[in-house]
Amino acid sequence: MHFVSYSLCYDVRSNIMEQPIYFYEPDENHGFLANFYPCSITVSGTCWPSSEHYYQAQKFDDVRLQEKVLRAEDAAQAFRLSREYQQWQRHDWYDIRVEVMRFIVREKFLQNTPLAHQLLATGDTELKEHSHKDAFWGDGGDGHGRNELGRILMMVREELQEHAPYNLVQFIDSAKLPTQWGTFQMYGFIEKATGKEHLALVYGDIEQQAAPLIRLHSECLTGDALFSARCDCGFQLAKALQNIVAEGAGVLLYLRQEGRGIGLINKIRAYHLQDDGADTVEANEQLGFGADMRDYAFCRGILSFLGIERVRLMTNNPRKVKALQLANIEVTERVPLQEGNNPHNHQYLRTKADKLGHMFDRNFVKP
């Protein structure tokens, strides 16, 4: 699926006056907003190829005509068939058509999670169907139209904004990320509760995986970028990316939760205390923090955006498994990620096992 960039929409925070988002053709920018956009929607056990198919079929009481519209090869043909059978249109159609449209547009986004996230990524920008042929559903081409479809889309957007997983993160943009192991697609998100920026690195076709291999990796500047041997983070990051490429598809979430959530400067303070003899948990507590301040609930929003409900999770940390389960993500398997044991971090790993419950093989971390 193609995801539209909304980096400009996010600039609303800097008081930039935004132009409306115009949509019409399904294969153009913002085409997912159009009724002609192909996406499956199930209503009472029947799968409709698009919201346009459903809307046009409801013009008729005759189930045989509804069936013909349902079987139309695309939305354009569904529209043409409704015109062809117009003489059999139900007498109260103009009284109920807005209600029908509201229903099917709402179902379109409720049943297609990636589209719902795309809709939310438009922020508060006005949405307009830019149709010069339709001054009821569209803007009439020159702005004089009622734009009823745009109004419905904005109503659905407002509703989604109030509920998880849609209120957890906002998708901003995506780009390719070539690495020494392979090329990933990098997606950027803003966590709505904190304003923190997080990444999803996606490799391969995750839609073909019943439960993609994933990793929740908390940012560690010292380990990931400065090659520190005090922890196992950098080693785990490299191995996780390698494992995903070897698998053929998978996701690494790079989470801005430096120092188990206490931040970079406080991590340096904690390192100082460790230099003086404290272990990693004691150092955090001496600074007034909990042993682990990280929160993973918002990850549900990112995984939802990617269409992921079941995962195989690379981790040694049972807390991550539990956090995803509490977020209604099924963890079908925990995949150990035991990397980087060395003389500089052996006691750190031992403390993670003894005090934080991390699961290591005996031959990896010895007493």
Curated annotation (Swiss-Prot):
| Transmembrane annotation, as ranges | none
One CC-aspect GO term: cytosol
State the needed cofactors, names only.
Answer: Zn(2+)
Q: State the pathway, as annotated in the record.
A: Cofactor biosynthesis; riboflavin biosynthesis; 5-amino-6-(D-ribitylamino)uracil from GTP: step 1/4
Q: Could you tell me the Gene Ontology terms of the biological process aspect for this record? A: carbohydrate derivative metabolic process; riboflavin biosynthetic process
Q: NCBIfam families, from UniProt? A: PRK00393.1 (NF001591), ribA (TIGR00505), ribofla_fusion (TIGR02464)
| Record bears the keyword Disulfide bond | no
A Pfam family (short name) is NADAR
- Spell out the molecular function terms from Gene Ontology: GTP binding; GTP cyclohydrolase II activity; hydrolase activity, hydrolyzing N-glycosyl compounds; zinc ion binding
State the EC number(s): 3.2.2.-, 3.5.4.25
What catalytic reaction does the record list?
A: 2,5-diamino-6-hydroxy-4-(5-phosphoribosylamino)-pyrimidine + H2O = 2,5,6-triamino-4-hydroxypyrimidine + D-ribose 5-phosphate; 5-amino-6-(5-phospho-D-ribosylamino)uracil + H2O = 5,6-diaminouracil + D-ribose 5-phosphate; GTP + 4 H2O = 2,5-diamino-6-hydroxy-4-(5-phosphoribosylamino)-pyrimidine + formate + 2 phosphate + 3 H(+)
What does the entry comment about cofactor binding?
Binds 1 zinc ion per subunit.
Record: residues binding Zn(2+): 220, 231, 233
The UniProt entry's sequence similarity note says:
In the N-terminal section; belongs to the YbiA family.
- The protein here is known as Riboflavin biosynthesis protein VVA0006
What enzyme class is recorded for this protein?
hydrolase
